[in-house]
């Protein structure tokens, strides 16, 4: 076979593969490979066609914009084709683009020459949104048509759907717009909108989307515009098509005019001069990429002067005056070599993908999270599969999907080990149950756990690492490596063992000398008097983060109350749902955990908890009989029915004793609700449980109120404070804890709603902002005086 024949075969193969991917991407909205893989195939085809120009044909994917309109929508012919942009993947690609532009404008630039010398070119710069390109046609200021790009020449008529996008003006604002104006831009979905859409889909059992781009495309191409209207779509203009009238003579000027007419444009639009300034913009947007509210995959540079754009013109499928500088791919293809199982702090046995190493977003990736076995099942994953992996920012790489057409015949199923890979204990499957706000319990999949607890070194190490962390017991100098040594040498088998370590035991650890040994023992001793909130957080209760730990400590006041609180009682705490309440209750009900806590509180060697006291007034005053009845989750008894029952009978005992005739006298209480209530309390276990909950509420100081009361029991309740600069008497974390203990919310930024800013040495922009807004400012002495006034220990 000759080289030409081999090239012809490869070209035919590439064209078929690219056409297939184009169809899946543009028509079905179901991309089967990452953009980076498509770009590689496309560049390979371009290179072969350049080397063998006799094999170039008009129907090659390199000679047209991808996609064909779906038959379900009417067709729209674009008077001016909607072409795609050329791509730059390396800095040299950008420099080559700038050189070609300057060469093409040699006769128009001051001091220009045929080699691209002379003045620098002005470029407009904006992020490249990852959405769907559309055209909006305005006639006499009225929106008359919306269309997709389609194949660049013919798109789909999506007018009724475009009209539902809230930031698309149906009538242009102001004046001076052309009689006919075609606005081109991107329809996209913000990250927050995408997450909310998927969360809603999960709740209703609907289909979730893989990414915001797919969600935007799928939403925009709905035949029922009511569905589109329910989706959080947005539009951002980046250019224009046909125009009957006049527009400004620069790209930036046109976009600024759009903004004046009510058409949204990018807030990141900038005008720069020269290739280096373009590179600086690219770097700046790249650094801020993860903080942006929407997904982008690069930036777009366009020659700013429209006259220069016309002079440069077009080539086969793209303008010569614009280029998209792509970011390193966040999605790549690789092979799943195997799956290993790791054991976490709570004993959860989770699968981790071992991958054939691949570069993703500039980093070599060989491992990726699989979350849990439900995710493995959802993906339909097998060892040997070709998979799409994604890495964004600091997020752990994830397996996004399986490329089924590349699955090998010998692909192997993934099975959970029967025994813990670390300690050999049994692995048990636990069904997760979500207790919804309604009356039903909903299965949420399963989790696999090692039953070895602290006898499992993996669980023990992670438990100790969490226990000593800065926001928990804050034992300085006890890093991960030291914890591993302590566990591996058998010196620590429980968090309580930290407080019995001797000088000799620590001194013998690798890397320790006299000073470091004394420092560590001092740090351990200094942690013996933690606040109740820190101690609760340090215990590592599943689903209990730092804020929930503070809430528990502030509301219930003592470890004893928290430990014996029934889950139904815990749900009276704000932001504590049923799932978290059951996790807390089950943790303290577990005998093993109770033993560990008892060891930690040993009078001779353990910790002495601070800030233990009474139940908070806000918690004690928040209960109502109607709310209590509603929380019992009796079928057909909703909040309204519960209020009627509370009003009619006045006490739980009265409701329990009510017979059928009594219940029928409750105004507008449905018969099925009355029957359900009677059936519920005919079960002795339900009566016993309800009375136990009421008894504990009363023990904790609650009394039924006809309405919920908000008690302003803390001196700084409702106030927002900000800490900035360096504090000398205490760390900012300690100051934050003390302010929160007084009821304040401690924020990270200053606004007009900020009550006070505490500024230590080195305070910068936050102090300046406070002065600008007229916000009260305290120095450290003022803060300490405040603490003294309210009896807060320094």
From Swiss-Prot:
<dbReference type="InterPro" id="IPR041663">
    <property type="entry name" value="DisA/LigA_HHH"/>
</dbReference>
<feature type="binding site">
    <location>
        <begin position="35"/>
        <end position="39"/>
    </location>
    <ligand>
        <name>NAD(+)</name>
    </ligand>
</feature>
<dbReference type="InterPro" id="IPR033136">
    <property type="entry name" value="DNA_ligase_CS"/>
</dbReference>
<keyword id="KW-0479">Metal-binding</keyword>
<feature type="binding site">
    <location>
        <position position="126"/>
    </location>
    <ligand>
        <name>NAD(+)</name>
    </ligand>
</feature>
<dbReference type="InterPro" id="IPR001679">
    <property type="entry name" value="DNA_ligase"/>
</dbReference>
<dbReference type="Pfam" id="PF22745">
    <property type="entry name" value="Nlig-Ia"/>
</dbReference>
<keyword id="KW-0520">NAD</keyword>
<keyword id="KW-0234">DNA repair</keyword>
<feature type="binding site">
    <location>
        <position position="423"/>
    </location>
    <ligand>
        <name>Zn(2+)</name>
    </ligand>
</feature>
<keyword id="KW-0227">DNA damage</keyword>
<dbReference type="InterPro" id="IPR018239">
    <property type="entry name" value="DNA_ligase_AS"/>
</dbReference>
<feature type="binding site">
    <location>
        <position position="326"/>
    </location>
    <ligand>
        <name>NAD(+)</name>
    </ligand>
</feature>
<dbReference type="GO" id="GO:0046872">
    <property type="term" value="F:metal ion binding"/>
</dbReference>
<dbReference type="Pfam" id="PF12826">
    <property type="entry name" value="HHH_2"/>
</dbReference>
<feature type="active site" description="N6-AMP-lysine intermediate">
    <location>
        <position position="128"/>
    </location>
</feature>
<feature type="binding site">
    <location>
        <position position="456"/>
    </location>
    <ligand>
        <name>Zn(2+)</name>
    </ligand>
</feature>
<dbReference type="InterPro" id="IPR001357">
    <property type="entry name" value="BRCT_dom"/>
</dbReference>
<dbReference type="InterPro" id="IPR012340">
    <property type="entry name" value="NA-bd_OB-fold"/>
</dbReference>
<feature type="domain" description="BRCT">
    <location>
        <begin position="711"/>
        <end position="794"/>
    </location>
</feature>
<comment type="similarity">
    <text>Belongs to the NAD-dependent DNA ligase family. LigA subfamily.</text>
</comment>
<dbReference type="InterPro" id="IPR036420">
    <property type="entry name" value="BRCT_dom_sf"/>
</dbReference>
<dbReference type="GO" id="GO:0003911">
    <property type="term" value="F:DNA ligase (NAD+) activity"/>
</dbReference>
<protein>
    <recommendedName>
        <fullName>DNA ligase</fullName>
        <ecNumber>6.5.1.2</ecNumber>
    </recommendedName>
</protein>
<dbReference type="InterPro" id="IPR004149">
    <property type="entry name" value="Znf_DNAligase_C4"/>
</dbReference>
<feature type="binding site">
    <location>
        <position position="302"/>
    </location>
    <ligand>
        <name>NAD(+)</name>
    </ligand>
</feature>
<feature type="binding site">
    <location>
        <begin position="84"/>
        <end position="85"/>
    </location>
    <ligand>
        <name>NAD(+)</name>
    </ligand>
</feature>
<keyword id="KW-0436">Ligase</keyword>
<dbReference type="GO" id="GO:0005829">
    <property type="term" value="C:cytosol"/>
</dbReference>
<dbReference type="InterPro" id="IPR004150">
    <property type="entry name" value="NAD_DNA_ligase_OB"/>
</dbReference>
<dbReference type="InterPro" id="IPR010994">
    <property type="entry name" value="RuvA_2-like"/>
</dbReference>
<feature type="binding site">
    <location>
        <position position="420"/>
    </location>
    <ligand>
        <name>Zn(2+)</name>
    </ligand>
</feature>
<feature type="binding site">
    <location>
        <position position="186"/>
    </location>
    <ligand>
        <name>NAD(+)</name>
    </ligand>
</feature>
<dbReference type="Pfam" id="PF03119">
    <property type="entry name" value="DNA_ligase_ZBD"/>
</dbReference>
<comment type="function">
    <text>DNA ligase that catalyzes the formation of phosphodiester linkages between 5'-phosphoryl and 3'-hydroxyl groups in double-stranded DNA using NAD as a coenzyme and as the energy source for the reaction. It is essential for DNA replication and repair of damaged DNA.</text>
</comment>
<dbReference type="GO" id="GO:0006260">
    <property type="term" value="P:DNA replication"/>
</dbReference>
<feature type="binding site">
    <location>
        <position position="149"/>
    </location>
    <ligand>
        <name>NAD(+)</name>
    </ligand>
</feature>
<keyword id="KW-0235">DNA replication</keyword>
<keyword id="KW-0464">Manganese</keyword>
<dbReference type="InterPro" id="IPR013840">
    <property type="entry name" value="DNAligase_N"/>
</dbReference>
<keyword id="KW-0460">Magnesium</keyword>
<dbReference type="GO" id="GO:0006281">
    <property type="term" value="P:DNA repair"/>
</dbReference>
């Amino acid at each position: 076979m000759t080289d030409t024949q081999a090239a012809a075969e490869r070209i035919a193969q590439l064209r078929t593969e690219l056409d297939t991917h184009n169809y899946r991407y543009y028509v079905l909205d179901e991309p089967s490979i990452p953009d980076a893989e498509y770009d590689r195939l496309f560049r390979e085809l371009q290179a072969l066609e350049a080397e063998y120009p006799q094999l170039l044909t008009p129907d090659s994917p390199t000679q047209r914009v991808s996609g064909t309109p779906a038959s379900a929508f009417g067709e729209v012919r674009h008077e001016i084709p909607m072409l795609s942009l050329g791509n730059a993947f390396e800095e040299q690609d950008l420099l080559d683009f700038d050189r070609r532009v300057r060469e093409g404008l040699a006769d128009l630039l001051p001091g220009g020459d045929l080699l691209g010398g002379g003045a620098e070119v002005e470029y407009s710069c904006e992020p490249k949104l990852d959405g769907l390109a559309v055209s909006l046609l305005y006639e006499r200021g009225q929106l008359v048509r919306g269309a997709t790009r389609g194949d660049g020449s013919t798109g789909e008529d999506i007018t009724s759907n475009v009209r539902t996008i809230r930031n698309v003006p149906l009538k242009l604002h102001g004046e001076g717009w052309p009689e006919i104006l075609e606005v081109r831009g991107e329809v996209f979905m913000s990250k927050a909108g995408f997450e909310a859409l998927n969360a809603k889909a999960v709740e209703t059992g609907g289909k979730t989307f893989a990414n915001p781009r797919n969600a935007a495309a799928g939403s925009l191409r709905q035949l029922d515009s009511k569905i589109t209207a329910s989706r959080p779509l947005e539009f951002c203009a980046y250019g224009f098509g046909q125009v009957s009238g006049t527009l400004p003579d620069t790209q930036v000027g046109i976009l600024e005019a759009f903004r004046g007419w009510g058409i949204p444009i990018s807030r990141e639009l900038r005008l720069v001069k020269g290739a280096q300034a373009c590179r600086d913009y690219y770097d700046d947007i790249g650094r801020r990429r993860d903080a942006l509210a929407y997904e982008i995959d690069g930036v777009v540079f366009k020659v700013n002067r429209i006259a220069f754009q016309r002079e440069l013109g077009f080539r086969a499928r793209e303008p010569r005056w614009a280029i998209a500088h792509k970011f390193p791919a966040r999605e790549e293809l690789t092979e799943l070599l195997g799956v290993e199982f790791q054991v976490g702090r709570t004993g959860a046995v989770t699968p981790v993908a071992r991958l054939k190493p691949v570069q993703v977003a500039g980093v070599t990736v060989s491992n990726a999270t699989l979350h849990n076995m439900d995710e493995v099942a959802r993906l339909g994953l097998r060892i040997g599969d070709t998979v799409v992996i994604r890495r964004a920012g600091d997020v752990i790489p994830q397996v996004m999907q399986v490329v089924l057409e590349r699955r090998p015949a010998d692909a192997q199923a993934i099975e959970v080990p029967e025994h813990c890979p670390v300690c050999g204990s049994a692995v048990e499957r636990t069904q997760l149950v979500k207790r919804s706000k309604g009356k039903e319990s909903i299965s949420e999949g399963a989790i696999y756990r090692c039953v070895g607890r602290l006898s499992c070194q993996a669980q023990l190490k992670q438990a100790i690492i969490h226990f000593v962390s800065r926001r928990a017991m804050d034992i300085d100098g006890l890093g991960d490596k030291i914890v591993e040594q302590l566990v591996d040498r058998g010196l620590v088998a429980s968090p309580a063992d930290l407080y019995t370590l001797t000088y000799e035991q620590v001194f013998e650890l690798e890397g320790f000398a006299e000073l470091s040994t004394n420092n560590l023992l001092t740090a351990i001793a200094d942690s013996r008097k933690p606040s109740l909130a820190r101690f609760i957080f340090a215990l590592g209760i599943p689903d209990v983060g730092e804020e929930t730990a503070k809430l528990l400590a502030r509301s219930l006041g003592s470890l004893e109350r928290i430990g014996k609180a029934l889950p139904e009682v815990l749900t009276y705490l704000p932001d504590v749902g049923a799932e978290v309440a059951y996790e807390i209750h089950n943790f303290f009900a577990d005998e093993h955990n109770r033993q560990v806590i008892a060891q930690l509180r040993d009078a001779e060697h353990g910790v002495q908890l601070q800030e233990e006291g009474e139940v908070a007034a806000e918690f004690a005053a928040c209960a109502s009989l109607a709310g209590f009845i509603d929380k019992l989750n009796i079928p057909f008894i909703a909040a309204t029915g519960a209020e009627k029952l509370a009003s009619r009978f006045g006490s739980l005992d009265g409701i329990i004793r009510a017979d059928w005739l009594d219940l029928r006298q409750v105004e507008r209480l449905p018969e099925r609700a009355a029957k359900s209530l009677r059936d519920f309390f005919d079960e002795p276990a339900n009566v016993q449980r309800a009375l136990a909950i009421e008894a504990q509420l009363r023990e904790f100081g609650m009394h039924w109120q006809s309405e919920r009361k908000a008690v302003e029991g803390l001196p700084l309740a409702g106030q927002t404070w900000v800490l900035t600069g360096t504090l000398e008497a205490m760390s900012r974390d300690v100051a934050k804890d003390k302010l929160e203990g007084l009821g304040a919310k401690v924020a990270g930024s200053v606004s007009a709603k900020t009550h006070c800013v505490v500024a230590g040495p080195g305070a910068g922009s936050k102090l300046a902002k406070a002065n600008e807004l007229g916000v009260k400012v305290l120095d450290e002495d003022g803060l300490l005086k405040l603490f003294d006034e309210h009896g807060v220990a320094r």
